[in-house]
Amino acid sequence: IKGIDEATGGRRRWDVGFHFGDWLALDGEGDDGFKGATEDGYIATAYYYQSADIVAKAAKLLGREEDAASYRTLADEIKASLQAEYFTANGRLALTTQTAYAVALYMDFAPEGSKERIADFLKEKLKVNKGYLKTGFVGTCLLNKVLSDYGNNELAYKLLLNEDCPGWLYAVNMGATTIWER
């Protein structure tokens, strides 16, 4: 965490250096299409936030109050940076990918009062995509949890049990035992 802070000059956004993005997402275009359409800096900063949040909680459990307070402050500052950079004043997420919505909800950094709206945007995005996931390694593992958390169990099951490409069961039915690369 300290290395990220040093590399970014304390800006609380991890948008420098190479990032894998939402590796192998199906919504990417161009030469870097394999990284998906979700901005690398958004994903990296989200994980920077989550890491600081986890360390703050762990330090508190271990009785390291000074470390807990320091990392809580850092996590709160990163969260504020995410909100300032990627959310409108009305709480609308500027990035409109399935992954962006899922990450904001799962990692719980969306502004208060906007979470249900973001969950609705995710649900609508999946409908527009005819119930198919467009996520890569980052977003895929979060989708069903987030959908279920926000009362969309039916849609979560539809994603899980989809036997058409690019559904999870398509790969299983084709004999896959690991996640496929393109």
Located regions from the model:
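Active-site core of glycosidic bond-cleaving carbohydrate-active enzymes
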Residues: 1-182
